[in-house]
Amino acid sequence: MRFVDYVSIEVVAGKGGDGIISFRREAHVDKGGPDGGDGGWGGSIYFVGDSGMNTLLPFYQTKKIFGYNGENGRPKRQTGANGKDIFIKVPLGTQVFLKKSLICDIILEKKYLIAKGGRGGLGNFHFRNSKNKAPRISENGELGQNFYLDLQLKVMADIGLVGKPNAGKSTLLSLISNSKPKIANYEFTTLVPQLGVVKIYENSFVTADLPGLIQGASSGKGMGIIFLKHIERCRAIVHVIDFGSDNKNPIKDFIEIKSELEKFNKKLLDLNQIVIANKCDLPNFQFNLANFKRKFPKIKIIKSSLISAKQNEINIIKEKMFGLLEEKQKKLEIQEINTSKIEFNLKAPFLIKSRNNGFFEITGELIQKIIQKIPLNSQENILRFNAKVKKIGLWDELIKKGIKPGDLVRIYEFEFHWN
């Protein structure tokens, strides 16, 4: 399956159903009164963390997600059915961004509210009072929340395997876990992160084989920054370095990898780290190992020839890796989305664009909400709409701009001539 770790999508929650204008009409019931029912809630959109997924490919193929609309109200004070909520599985480690701000970090197998469905509109039964016992007033359902989101996947791994291309990372992952990554004797065999579950005694942890890093990776060279971000999730780092092959310089390789990690995110250097010195069966190994120990005396090193490693060597590697996690307990910051707090900006209730030919166009989030909510299907609703826009100062502002009788006014889809 194709690995996709970044997509942009649009989510549109369901619109609330419209309230209706209705009056009770039954035999032998004189002046039955208003009985228009309310609209149902629009369906919301949820993301659900799924440990069985490891790619955002489904979103790459489906760029828009629409919620189900609520049903309109019915006579006899019947409320319309709510729109069905949508639950969409996403890989654990998915981050959700709205206008480049992180609003949700999906790290648990639970549901996260992404876009809330619109409230259903009120039917005329709700507008009855002692002065108006037969109101011809109703409301449309509110639009569901509509967001353009960026999704970014950072794999959920406890330990990240890093190193130069063809250093032996994929071989190591295949030995310690149930993963079967592609292994070959050429650079950049691993083109996407590979995950494996490592079992040790009664415990287990997840290890990620990340594509080989080269000098300049933090600036986009090679596999580059595309996959460096996946290391940020890890709690520990294991460097796999070729100590035995000709023309290899383990000291230089280690310094370059650490430098790229630091340039990308300085906090990565605070993680527990060990080095697996690979290819101990080759002639250059002992010379390179001695030089490395002199240069980095405090670095923990595990000697191995991964391609011919025995089971007891593999068990030692697994124990050392698990020890890195025991030293530093897992700390996860969980930030859940709360889209109900993402409100429309009402600081500018409307914007008037006027033209020389007597045409005035009105836009703005507040005026859009008003005209969307109040259906202009009765004289009382028109009067209610008029009172709302007068209250926010729209009519006064049009007069200041020199509007004349007969001029055309457009408020989104609604047009009328000024009188």
Swiss-Prot record:
Residues 342-419 form the OCT domain. It comes from the Bacteria. It is an enzyme of class 3 (hydrolase). It is found in: Cytoplasm. One of its GO terms (cellular component) is cytoplasm. Mg(2+) binds at residues 170, 190. Its EC number is 3.6.5.-. Signal peptide: none annotated. Monomer. This is GTPase Obg. It comes from Mesomycoplasma hyopneumoniae (strain 232). The gene is obg.
